[in-house]
Amino acid sequence: MKEKLTEALQALKQKTPLVHAITNVVTVNDCANSLLAVGASPAMCEAADEVFEFSQLAGSLYLNLGTLTKEQEMAAYLAIRGATLKGIPVILDPVACGAIPRKKATIERLGHFGRFTVIKGNLGEVKALAGLAARVRGVDSLDEGNDGLEACQSLARAYGCVVAATGKVDIVADGQRACLIENGTEMLTRITGAGCMAGALVAGFCGAYEDAFGATVAALLTMSLAGELAQETSGGELPGTFRAHLIDQLSLVDEALIEKRGRVQWL
């Protein structure tokens, strides 16, 4: 499976996929810059009278519900409909769905308009969507339990898609295959937007590589490796310096680094 990760990164660099992102106002710039850093092309288009057509031109669609307005909600329905009609991968980031009931209702309605290729959230969000008890604080997960794999597999089977739960150890599952990504750094929890950036990267990789499971693993591993390197090169204590180094290091992750430092446990 490890060769799939390097294949996915090569595909991303070669194809420069256009990623249509409807994301939150807190991290829109971070998502755009992270996509540019790895070689994708971001388009933060969310006007309701444009998204249906635009989503059909993209390589993938990234829906992030972090600061969901009524206007964004309508745009998301139109965009997922357009993307699904064209067979374009749709990545959902269900930010704070464990804390805000309206967001779970929105996700259910999105499922009526189209199909998710990947659902990427923290463990609390994944457990909430899977109908399991989840401990959350706003957009953050307080869960670190041993039932994360079960939650991911259950949600993957329910939606027929890949599910990823990020945390100290990232979990990726598709109902049959699963893996644990053991790279990363606690510094990623000390800046706003690391999870959103990871979701955007998943969209970038899925826009270039057909195997959504492999693309998701490659994206999250890229984010984790960049975080490790950013901590090393920035001194590891100042979050603002770390953020700047993170974007730089995203641009430097290559096949050799994945082979040398990637710690992925295939289950």
UniProtKB/Swiss-Prot annotation:
Enzyme class: transferase
Reaction catalyzed: 5-(2-hydroxyethyl)-4-methylthiazole + ATP = 4-methyl-5-(2-phosphooxyethyl)-thiazole + ADP + H(+)
Coiled coil: none
Pfam families documented for this protein: HK
Entry annotated with the keyword Metal-binding: yes
Known pathway: Cofactor biosynthesis; thiamine diphosphate biosynthesis; 4-methyl-5-(2-phosphoethyl)-thiazole from 5-(2-hydroxyethyl)-4-methylthiazole: step 1/1
UniProt-annotated binding residues for ATP: K120, T166
Keywords carried by this UniProt record: ATP-binding, Kinase, Magnesium, Metal-binding, Nucleotide-binding, Thiamine biosynthesis, Transferase
A GO molecular function held by the record: magnesium ion binding
Described purpose of this protein according to its UniProt entry: Catalyzes the phosphorylation of the hydroxyl group of 4-methyl-5-beta-hydroxyethylthiazole (THZ).
NCBIfam families with a match to the protein in the record: PRK09355.1, thiM
Protein name, per record: Hydroxyethylthiazole kinase
Organism: Desulfitobacterium hafniense (strain Y51)
Gene (name only): thiM
